[in-house]
């Protein structure tokens, strides 16, 4: 079964990275905030492996700020 919230979080993190690096247009703060919210939402319904990846996503977002 596919975890939609996890997939959303992954997508929003990728988008935040792209915006921050100038490869995509958009508001950097909003992109990071949206990604952080998605990571937080995905955490509760995730497997241990997904949680580990979510933690890595969070670290990645922290470095973008």
From Swiss-Prot:
This is Uncharacterized protein YizC. InterPro entries: DUF3813 (IPR024217).
